Amino acid sequence: MAVVFLPGYIALRFLRFPRFGSFALAPAWTMAIVGIGAIVLNDGDVGWNRASFALLSVLVILICPIVRRHVSAVFGADRAPYGAYPRKTMAVAIGLPVAVLLVMLAPILILMDPTVPSWSPDPMFHYNGVNAVLLRENASMFGAMDTNHGIRVAGTVYPSVWHGIVSLVAATGTIVPASHVLAFVVIPIIWVVGMSYLATKALPYHPIAAMLVPVMLLAFPIFPGYLTVVNGLWPNSLALAATPAVMGAVVAAYHRYRWGGRQNAKEILLLSVAVVAVGVVGVAAAHPSTAFTLGWIAIPAVIMVVVHAMRDRLNAMQGRKGILLTVLVVLAMVAALALALSSSIVRDYLGRSMPRGWDDVSARLVSALAVWPVGRNPIVLAGASIVMVSAIVIGLRVVIRRRHLYWIALAWVMQTLLILGAFFPLGPLTSVAGLWYHNAYRLFAVQVIFLALILALAASEVIGWLSRFATKGAPARSMSAQTDVIARRPAFVGGMAAALIVVLFCASFVYNKPTVYAQAKPKFGADQILKSRAELDFIAHLDDYIPKRSIVVGDPTSGIAYAPAFGPIDSVFSSIVVRNVDVEGKILANGLRSIEYDPRVCQVLNAYGINYYYEDAPITYQGINGAESVPGLHSVDTSNGYFHLVAEVDGARLWQITGCPGRAEAPNWWNVRDRRLSVIQPPLDSVR
């Protein structure tokens, strides 16, 4: 918590940014410090560690008061109608997010064991990524994960902010629990705080709705539960969790400029844009897809702002200046699009093939509304459709009455179009959805931001109707009237919110929430990566059997890929997939069992000092059997004189490879220069 929140919070407070905004936006700022700072440190050959991170944080914090002194405007009291809660209702306003967090966290914390690795494929890569950052002291996205793809070190651009943050609190042996704390505890806190902040800024005339936004998050098991617990998309989840706070800062900046008066308007805009820009850099560094998300949903809002600004300018300018401004704006938009399309990586994503057709149209449409797959049962489809359509219509009815809320509806529409593009072949929409791998779950998670706002507005309307019915009074449409309702009947509002928490939590079970929670429970068994807790203990303490920094080869789904996260042991393969670019790794994956007949096997083993082999029965993982994906690491004849048994636990065996002639002292496994070139003579472009 301190690493994620403290640097950003102190920096923003030195800029005199409001306390709540500083707390909500702090993670995004910290991510910017980590993301940009790690790149700078790596380019300067300075190691990434706690001391260098502390130095970077101090430098950023010291720069902030200098910036503040040179900008006359400060973030003081607002004229914007944010509708501060009355003192007597602060307990409700603070208590609801806390209650939501408890409901989110309690089931996962009860079920999970922080010391047992997640069974999902991505976490295995991330554990080893943190280990690589710790050992190489490199958290730059332009190199931190270079060693995380097997033997061959290949230039890799990969967001490593998540790994850099975990490395600041972890050590060899504590990578797994440190990763789980960030993924399962800190990310939900960032998410709920950010959504609460966005609610207060986006719904200035609807304090009841603003209070209910965090509550609405319980209706959606997709995030953070599914993405963090089931899928293990931790860097993506970290960036997404901080995104609502950045959006809230954008809305706050716009409101400050519009409602702050003419005095210091330019300075307010300048400083606000700077604060937002750092936040955007932070979430984009944590996961670049977030930048595309913000850009996509902002298209309608940007067009509206540009049109209004141009209209105002054209009215105040001579025709020639107006035309020049129009041309400049159009050129800027074209330049931004051209810059994005100039990247070959972006073009590859846009050109991804679409894996789906036009089957199950009704089920997909309902899932697009509910942001969760609801199955094909007609009764469930009808029920989910009625509930979601009714709630969305009521919420949008409120939105269209307030011009400053239009952006919520437009963002929801834009995200819905992306989801439909991921579900159906819709030409350009499907191409854009390729930036998110046509993965509807990633898009669902973003949609929760806007649906929570819309549903909170709908719930606020319903509470207003009930309050009116109970008091036989006029509906509370204005901000002051809604504030009066909260002030006069805090117990009523709090009770309704508490009841809503219970209802949403129970109703979410219709959406398979028990499945999400169940995935947090440790999995052991013959069909799992870890057969038993005894095998986990064996893997975690391999340095009791073999020398430290020994290198072990084995099927990553046998569990050996977890070894570096628990102790000073290195695994040849650190993720589920053995990549084609890893020529030497493919030789072992396909041919270790041919060690007697293929001289290349011993050549690779000797060159890198790979002295141990971890043997376990193959399992089917993610639909692929290990005996098919890495056939050379199974059915190995260990009685041929090349192997010596070191230890055995629950069917898993650790063998020392002793039969390769001409073994010499191996180079340092973490000297990446020795792993960039092929040791096979002659070099091979592929492995049969």
Which functions belong to the PLM regions below?
Residues 100-241, 261-263, 519-522, 528-529:
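Active-site lumenal/periplasmic loops and adjacent helix-entry segments of GT-C-fold
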